[in-house]
């Protein structure tokens, strides 16, 4: 089991927590998370379409070709993770129920560098924030392995 801690100070909820102190109950990292099944979009945006989108991306205007979704049950926790077409989500990714219902948003960007590699910055910190948000909303926290595995699967698919 790994205890997740914040690197700096946390001033949220009028609580200052010194560096190195657990912020929330430990969330177990599981090595039992199965590989993410790949059912990617068979007709993703073309290079020209992507270039136009990246020139003026906006917010909530364009959606990704693919998403990772998983099922949660009390008996198994998070399981059946799969990369699927973004349009495969019921009603699409822009529906109000998804954005105004009880949900969590955690932003993370992956950047391509001059050496051709793709980098993210501290995805473990994003996973921790996502877990903390889940605790606040009484939702089951997503294990760090699954969170980062989903990011890796999406980045691999998008660079293909």
Can you name each region flagged by the protein language model?
Residues 2-160:
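Conserved alpha/beta cores of soluble small-molecule-handling proteins
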């Amino acid at each position: 089991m790994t205890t997740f801690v914040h690197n700096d100070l946390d001033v949220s909820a009028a609580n200052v927590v010194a560096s190195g102190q657990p912020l929330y109950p430990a969330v177990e990292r599981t090595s039992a998370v199965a590989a993410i099944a790949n059912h990617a979009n068979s007709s993703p945006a073309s290079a020209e379409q992507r270039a136009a989108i990246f020139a003026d991306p906006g917010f909530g205007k364009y959606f990704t070709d693919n998403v990772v979704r998983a099922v949660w049950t009390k008996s198994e926790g998070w399981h059946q993770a799969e990369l699927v077409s973004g349009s495969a989500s019921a009603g699409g990714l822009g529906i109000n129920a998804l954005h105004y219902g009880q949900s969590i948003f955690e932003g993370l960007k992956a950047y391509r560098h001059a050496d051709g590699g793709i980098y993210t910055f501290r995805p473990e910190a994003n996973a921790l924030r996502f877990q903390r948000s889940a605790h606040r909303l009484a939702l089951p926290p997503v294990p760090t392995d699954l969170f980062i595995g989903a990011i890796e699967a999406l980045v691999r698919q998008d660079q293909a």
